[in-house]
Structure formats: C-alpha cells, structure tokens
C-alpha cells in the first residue's frame, strides 16, 4: 500500500529491477569507509537519528518530480542487511546512471512508516564497486519473529500455493488491482499465497515493476491453486508486504 500522496511520475518508469535483467558482477560488500556505519550499527540507531551507510543499488522505483525536484526510491543492500531509501533527491540524468549493483554512500535520517524502516532526506555519493545480491530464501521464516530481521532484503519464497482473494463484487479471484480490488490495469497487484497452512499477501509494486514487466504479466495469469516460486524485496506495511519482482509457476 502506498503512502497517501499524489505522485506525478515523469515519463516512463525508470526501472533497474534485478528481476528485469542485468548481469551480476561481484564486489566485496563487507568493506566500509571510515565513518560509515555497519549494518548492525544502522539497525541499532535510533529513529530520527542521522545515519551514514554504504550499500549497493538493487532496484529502483520510477523516477519522478516532487515539487520540482527529481526523486527516486531505492532498494539497496550490503553483505549484512538492506536499506529502503525513500524519495532521494536526484536528477533524471544521474538517476539513469544508478544501475543495479552501483555502490553508493548515503547520508540521511532513519525513519519508520507503518513498520517499514527507511532512510529519508537522503544525500548520496557514487563510489567504486559493484554488487548484486542473490535472493535469500526466507520461506521458512514466514510467520516467525525472525522474518523482520531480513527487512528490505532481496529474498525468495518457494513452493507457495496461490490462494483466493475476493474482488469488489465478492468473487474469488487469483489477484486484485489495488489491495481492495478497486483498481485497474497499471495499478499495484495484490495476491495471496500460502505455505504450511498460513496465507500471506504479496504485492507487485507498480512503481517498481509496471504493467509491461514479466512479473506483472505473470501475476495476471495466475490461477487459484497454482504452486509458485517468487523473488522480491521484503517490504513491510503493518506487517510483511513483499514487493515481488519475479513469479514462476511450478
């Protein structure tokens, strides 16, 4: 679910989503410059405090202009954890250079929105280095207190069963446009999937993977009862609400 704000997306979404392609090239994500927090230090930092991190861009939502200033929201990760960098000011030209794997240093403030920990008011610097994370399988952590420790990481869910959602008319369907079924083509997709007798909700965030992407099309083709594997980012909104970037029907 999005924050309640009017978003004027500029042009076509500029995606650098891991699931949408791009070659993985490795760097040592454990190295930190002087004065930069480790992930453990960032995790322990108080909300509203200034934080300084180094991480690698894994994906971006669409660049747009907010009150005349270009901004982009970034999913970033290092060896030990992940970061959600919200509406970072950046020009369109510079944003286009932030491809998946790019190393950045970010200074901003730690904040929280409905359980999602993020960095706001961010300033960035591009550094040498490149790293694209492999998906961490967190299927066994669903429903446990340990899942939140992986918040914002690129993760995988395996062997899950598509469960019915109910649309605005009360019909059972495999997915919804928007969380309540009130949307249309191009909006976020919501769908339910279960494992070990428990059902969870997953989202295709349209600002991350729009209607022209493989994952958006794949979710629209799901059938109730399908067994699927998924990859995406472990976003939080009043509980776990993963932003899915890849779906494979078994």
Question: Language model features by range: what are they?
Answer:
Residues 16-19:
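C-terminal motif of bacterial Sec signal peptides marking the signal peptidase cleavage site
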Residues 1-11, 22:
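Positively charged n-region of N-terminal signal peptides that target proteins for export
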Residues 22-250:
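OB-fold single-stranded nucleic acid-binding module
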């Amino acid at each position: 679910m999005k924050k309640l704000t009017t978003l004027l997306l500029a042009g076509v979404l500029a995606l650098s989503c891991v699931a949408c392609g791009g070659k993985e090239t490795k760097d040592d994500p454990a190295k930190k410059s002087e004065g930069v927090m480790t992930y453990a230090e960032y995790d322990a930092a108080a909300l509203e405090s200034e934080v300084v991190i180094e991480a690698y861009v894994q994906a971006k939502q669409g660049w747009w202009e907010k009150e005349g200033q270009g901004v982009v929201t970034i999913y970033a990760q290092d060896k030990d954890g992940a970061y959600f960098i919200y509406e970072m000011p950046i020009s369109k030209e510079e944003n286009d250079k932030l491809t998946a794997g790019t190393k950045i240093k970010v200074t901003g403030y730690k904040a929280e929105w409905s359980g999602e920990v993020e960095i706001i008011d961010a300033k960035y610097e591009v550094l040498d280095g490149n790293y694209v994370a492999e998906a961490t399988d967190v299927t066994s952590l669903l429903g446990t207190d340990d899942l939140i420790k992986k918040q914002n990481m690129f993760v995988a869910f395996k062997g899950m069963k598509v469960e019915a959602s109910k649309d605005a008319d009360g019909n059972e369907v495999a997915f919804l446009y928007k969380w309540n079924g009130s949307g249309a083509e191009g909006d976020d997709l919501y769908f339910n999937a279960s494992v070990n007798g428990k059902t969870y909700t997953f989202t295709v965030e349209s600002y991350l993977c729009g209607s022209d992407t493989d994952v958006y099309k794949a979710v629209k083709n799901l059938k109730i009862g399908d067994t699927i594997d998924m990859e995406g980012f472990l976003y939080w909104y009043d509980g776990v609400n993963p932003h899915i970037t890849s779906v494979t029907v078994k």
